[in-house]
Structure formats: C-alpha cells, structure tokens
Amino acid sequence: MEEYKDTLNLNTTTFSMKGNLSVNEPKTYAKWQEQQAFKRMQARKDNHGDFTLHDGPPYANGHLHLGHALNKILKDIVVKREYFKGKKIYYTPGWDCHGLPIEQQILERLEKEKTSLENPTLFREKCRDHAKKFLEIQKNEFLQLGVLGDFEDPYKTMDFKFEASIYRALVEVAKKGLLKERHKPIYWSYACESALAEAEVEYKMKKSPSIFVAFGLKKESLEKLKVKKASLVIWTTTPWTLYANVAIALKKDAVYALTQKGYLVAKALHEKLAALGVVDNEITHEFNSNDLEYLVATNPLNQRDSLVALGEHVGLEDGTGAVHTAPGHGEEDYYLGLRYNLEVLMSVDEKGCYDEGIIHNQLLDESYLGEHVFKAQKRIIEQLGDSLLLEQEIEHSYPHCWRTHKPVIYRATTQWFILMDEPFIQNDGSQKTLREVALDAIEKVEFVPSSGKNRLKTMIENRPDWCLSRQRKWGVPLAFFIDKRTNKPCFESEVLEHVANLFEKKGCDVWWEYSVKDLLPPSYQEDAKHYEKIMHILDVWFDSGSTFKAVLEDYHGEKGQSPSDVILEGSDQHRGWFQSSLLIGCVLNNQAPFKKVITHGFIVDEKGEKMSKSKGNVVSLDKLLKTHGSDVVRLWVAFNDYQNDLRVSQTFFTQTEQHYKKFRNTLKFLLANFSDMDLKNLERPHNFSPLDHFMLETLETISAGVNSAFEEHDFVKGLNILMAFVTNELSGIYLDACKDSLYCDSKNNEKRQAIQMVLLATASKLCYFLAPILTHTIEEVLEHSQALRIFLQAKDVFDLKDISVSEKLHLKEFKKPENFEAVLALRSAFNEELDRLKKEGVIKNSLECAIEVKEKALDENLVEELLMVSFVGIAKEKLSETPAFTLFKAPFYKCPRCWRFKSELENTPCKRCEQVLKER
C-alpha cells in the first residue's frame, strides 16, 4: 500500500503546528510598530461610523502586573472588534503621572541618599523623571501584549498642555460656583500627612477598642426629667475622639429607657445591652427622645458640656441609641453640628498626634501632647474610671489609606471642595445640583454588567462633597490667588486664563518658581502685594477625571469623539475614575463623558484569594509571556467571565493553551487542505453537496451567534460557540466525512473543489472572529495562505472584514440534507455499536462495515459519508443487529489506496481510485 501514498492529496502548509509564540510574537509586534499599524488602522474607513474607547490611565510607577494585562487586553479586543466591523477607531493610551506614590518613591530615595530637597521645583523635576522612566517601561510592556493604540502620541497628565487643560477644567468648576473652601472633617492620612478623597480610601479589617461610656446628665437636666440620677450611655470604637465630644445624638421619635441604676439607653436596645452587662435589667422610666432634646450631659473625660441632640443618622440596630458626637472628627457629626451650632473641636496635627489645642481648650492634660491618637487610646480608656461600663475589642471594616495601607482618621481641616448640593445653571437655563445632574446622566449611560448602574448611582446619591485639595508637591496646583483685602479667591477670567497660558507654555512648576507678580497678568501686577498664592495641589482623581476634556475635546475630535463610546476599567473604578469623570463631565457639559461603562473583576489566585507577595501567590506576567506567549494570555482573558474575578494558576493557563492549540491545529488543517486549490476557482460558483450546505448554513448560524455575543462584549460566550462549532460540527462531523474526498479524489474533482471552498469560507470566518483576540496568530495564518488572502481581499490581518458566506459563494439559499437529524441520530447509535465491536475485536474500523438502514427514506450517500462505512445495503456476513440498523462485513476488498472496502479484486484499487490514477 506504501506505493500509493504519493498519489494521495496529503497536502501540507508552511503554517506550523507549534506557534513558538514567545519567540515569534515580538518579531511581529516590532514589524507592526515599524509599519505604523495603528495609523494604518485609523486611516481605513468603511463608512460604518466612528468608535472611541477612552483609556482610563494607569499610574506611571512600577512594572505591569496581570491586572494591567487584563485591562489593556480587554480594551484592545473591544477596539479591534469595532475596527474589523469597519469603523474608524480612536484609542489613545494614557498615563496618570502625578500623585503620592511617586512622591514617596522620591522621598525614600532621598532618605537613602541622606539628602533633603527643599526646593519644590527640583523635587518636582525628580518626580517627573521618575514618571517618564516608568511610562516608557510600561509602554514597552503593553506593546508586548499585542496591544495597539496611539502609543506614538499617548496622553500624559504631566505634559504642559495637559496640566493647563486640567487647570482650565478646575476654572470651569470655580466659575460655576461649585468650588468652595470649607473647614470640615475629611479623611486624613497621617502616614501621608495629606487629605484624602473618598476614592483614595480602601476598607480593611482592623481591631479597635469597643467601649460603652456613661455621660451623666447635669442637675438642670435631671430636674427637667424629675429623676435623681441619669446617665446617657454612648458606644464608640474611637475613644481618642472623646476629647472633642460636644453632643450626644438620639434617634428622633424613639423611646428611651431609664434603668434602676440610672442608665439611659434606647428601649429597643435595652435587652441586648443588659445581656452584655452594660446596663441593669429593671426599667423605671421611659421617655420620648423629643423630650430629651437640648438636655445637657457631662463628658467624663474632661468635664465639658455635651448637648443632647436629635440626628437622622442614629440607628437602633447596634450600640445604645445614643451616639457620641464630635464635629471635628466625623462628617455626620459635623452636619449635626451645623444644625445645632455646635463647636468644632479638632486638636490633632498632620501626623495624627494631639497638638497644643488640647491644652488651650482644656480638653486633655499636657501629658497627651505629641502622642499619637491610636497610642493614646489605652490611657484615655483608663482615665474614664467608673464611667467606663464595658470595654471589648472588635474587628471591623475600617477606612485605610490606599497608598500606605495604614488606617486613616477623620480630621477637620480647611480644604477646597466641589459642592455636590449647590445649584448651578444648566445649558437650558434651569438650576440643578451636581448630584442631580450626575444622577440624571447615569440614566442615559449603558452599563456592562447592568449592575454597575445601581452601584454608581448609590455612590453618587451618598457621596460627600469632593475634597480637592492636597498638601503635597507633585501635582497640578490649585492655582488661585486669595485677595488679602477681602480674604476671597480671585476668579477673574483675565487672571485665570493668564495662569492657564503660563502652564501651557512652561508647565505648572511656575506656580512654585514665580513670584505672585510674575504670575499675574500686567493689569494686575501693581496690586500684586494684595494677593497670595494657594499652595495646595489637586487630588489626582481630578487629573484623571478631566482626561476626556484634555484628550477628546481639546483635540477637537482628532483623538476621538466626546462623549466616548466606551470606557472600560476594573470594578473598583465606580468609586474612582468613573465618578470623577462623571462629575467633571456634568459640571463642564451637563452630561456624562461616556456612553457605555464596561467593568471587569480582579485577578485572584486559584482559591479566589487576592494576590500578594507575602502570600507567595503572585503570578508573574513576564513569566507567563515567556512560557505561553501573549496570544495565549489574550485568549485566557477572552475565555474568562471577566465581569467577575478571574482565577489564575498554571492549570488555568495550561487549559487555555489547549484551547489555543485546538484553534491553531484546526486552522492548520484547513489551510493544508485547500493549499492545492486552483485560485481560478475562488470566484466561480460551485455545486455544493447537501453536506456542504449543512456546513455552510451552520457556519452562518454560529456566525450570527458569535457576532451577537461579541456585540454584548460577552467574549467567553462567543468563544464557546466557536469552540463548540470547531469541535462538533466542523471536526466531529464535516471534516471526518470529507477526508476521503480531500485525500483521495482527483484535484479537479468538483465535489472536492466544493469542499475546499467550504473549508476556505470556514477559515475566513475563524480568522475574522479570532483576529481581535489572537491578532498575531491570524496575521501568521494569512501570511501562509495566498488563497485565504485572495478570498478575503486582505494582504494581512489589518485588511480583514466580515464577509457573507452565501454571497461570497453565490448561494441564494441553503439546501440542508433531508432527514439530516435522523442521519445524525443513526450515526450516534452506529458509533456506539462500532465501539462495542472494536472492543470485542470483531472489526478495527468503520470502513470494514456495510450497513442496512431500517429507515428507507434516508439518503444512502449521506449515510455512507457520515458513518464512514464502505457500503450501504445488505451483505452476506452479518456482524450485529439493532432496531435501527443491521451491520455486515463489507462485501468487497480493501482498496490499497483509499482503504475503503470497494475493490472487486484483492490488492487492486477501487474504481474511483483507478480513475484518479489514470488522470495523474
């Protein structure tokens, strides 16, 4: 039989089974950069509209990790998908360059070098150099992922023009009356010595003291209640704030119970508190909280008065129903203080230590001066004496600084805020608050997943005013002048635009370098002595939140349209970039700066735990790329439900590699089997068999399914449809049935040529759907197939576009085989019986069989093809019988060329093979 091997169509392709991705991909990516692939993508337009994905900036510090890869790969898939649909695409990657982490890096370096740098300009220069260094590192690492974008001209928040744009956005906020200076409690990082915005706070578990303290009512209050003794019992987990207590808040219209021992608590909580031993069991009096308002108690720590007030924030689920109130250390306390005109006491310095205010205001004795508040808590608790009713330790969720990961405190300071509830004029002349405008805007935005809408909505509903000012150096300054004659900020347009122009030309370092006079426009310079600079910098979330203006609006559409079609970030950005962008967009334009928000989860280990170096469960991105290649990493991203957290381990990547090999080997098989086709046959109509029609109709059906899934950004659903098709209909049915014709028929055989056209159409669809994900691999596929390039009219991957199979193959309709489901059912039953006969050693393969089918309406040729038997009909030697069919030994001899049992003489080719051999 060996002599016939060379007569078979055992075609090959130069497309390798092994991708050797880690070696070949960098060459491809270098070629794309050299050819300016992204510019070419932007130049192509098929009149299917524009698409802008606005990039949320990563921080220009450190190397990339797998979380960065997840985010950028998803963006790249979304952008390329829109590109291959024929849209003009815009995607400008960017970097967040200002902020505390870089400052800390520079300070640590200076400390190691044992040098100090008081000059703010030189310090900022070092910060800028650090950001530049890591920006370039990260840029090259992104390119290794096969990500394409305008990396030649990315946006950087530290560029002079960008800093000016950020400042101009701030000016708009000020002009609309939403920027105000306030003395109020805010999150304060004593580790960073700076204010924090809500987005810069993360919640982690922390152990804290939990204490119940009795505040005795003063004599006049006892007389009003007509009782001899009564103490309101408060519960707190921040004993260090007791020094600043000025009030006790009760729930409005609630019943409060006085016990025999004189403890006053909410009646709804009395039983629980008695069980803890905080109060005694017997109730002697009951009071409505409204009757307790304006009574006065005594703070046992410093004997200062504490007013009884009523607060909407007081709950009856935990605690005592009596809330310790210190307006200098809590936002709800602060707002209650405004209603009751309470004193704001705050005697804690930037480092979190008690300052001299504790002595001046007689809040604590001088031994506490300079002591950190958390360290002082033990002594404070001891000082309470008999007023301490119970002390425990609890573990609870507590705010921490997201940069230092240390606990934060609430501390009243003078800061600049964007006001959420101050009405301002809209485009239509009406007045709404920023909170109202933002909530209205959310309703017009699409969210993927849809749960993101309520998440963002709830955050906007409940968020406080936005604290903008930071007491640092590396950032855009809050560059306003205070007029010392009025003690008010100067918001004159001439002054503000002059500063903005200086920033655009020379960078905002000038705010530190120049004198007040040099920063003012000429017409104001005579009065320079009356002005002083505000020396705060802006919250970096304002930088990133105004990127839509700096990138999309300031370039007048050159870098994309505003509002952008899509923004795509991790789910943590609901409290970060999504909010800051939304709020600034609503101030500037009365609308969200984006139409759709897509969110993804986080990278966790195989157990679902967060990755950390201390746990030793970090998976190195660099190692993954070297082991598997970027296309496998990209496929892993797309083959996962990215809307939830993504589990990572070597096992998961090994599984993904198997998926990749399945796609690659399928494409290799397809390429090999139409590699010998006559290119003249590409455009002419073909006579397709019923089985071909089944395959082509299936191809169009699954194409619709994949397109639908990809439109919804459900890549895992689309890929599962594609993988099921490749495994079942393509490999499991069609290719098995066609191998005989592909290998053994004449090259000019019409049936074989029609099959090759089906394979070509299938390969083209696989290329189209996989190109946004496996861009390098599909580029490689096209390099190795001239037929595919001609069929798709694509010289490389960037020329790809969707095709209609029916139009391309001149088909007006698909003629699916009659009774096809019945033939497939027969095939399934046949394969079961075949396996049994193989195990018993009766036969070796299906070609040894003849089959008699009980259902006479079935097409015999189709049965022979799909079951891969040599004969359909009755033969002499019965092998087995089932209700649906009878199996016989094939009645003819084995053909030495095609191995089917169709030869009339032993060791002689069958009639088909004999004819093929004559034509050679």
Curated annotation (Swiss-Prot):
Zn(2+) binds at residues 895, 898, 910, 913. L-isoleucyl-5'-AMP binds at residue 569. Binds 1 zinc ion per subunit. Its cofactor is Zn(2+). Its EC number is 6.1.1.5. It comes from the Bacteria. GO terms for cellular component: cytosol. A motif ('HIGH' region) lies at residues 58-68. Gene3D superfamilies: 1.10.730.20, HUPs (3.40.50.620), Ile-tRNA synthetase CP2 domain-like (1.10.10.830). It is found in: Cytoplasm. The keyword Transmembrane does not apply. The keyword Transmembrane helix does not apply. GO terms for molecular function: aminoacyl-tRNA deacylase activity; ATP binding; isoleucine-tRNA ligase activity; tRNA binding; zinc ion binding. It is an enzyme of class 6 (ligase). Belongs to the class-I aminoacyl-tRNA synthetase family. IleS type 1 subfamily. NCBIfam families: ileS. IleRS has two distinct active sites: one for aminoacylation and one for editing. The misactivated valine is translocated from the active site to the editing site, which sterically excludes the correctly activated isoleucine. The single editing site contains two valyl binding pockets, one specific for each substrate (Val-AMP or Val-tRNA(Ile)). Monomer. This is Isoleucine--tRNA ligase. It comes from Helicobacter pylori (strain ATCC 700392 / 26695). The lineage of its organism: Bacteria, Pseudomonadati, Campylobacterota, Epsilonproteobacteria, Campylobacterales. The gene is ileS.
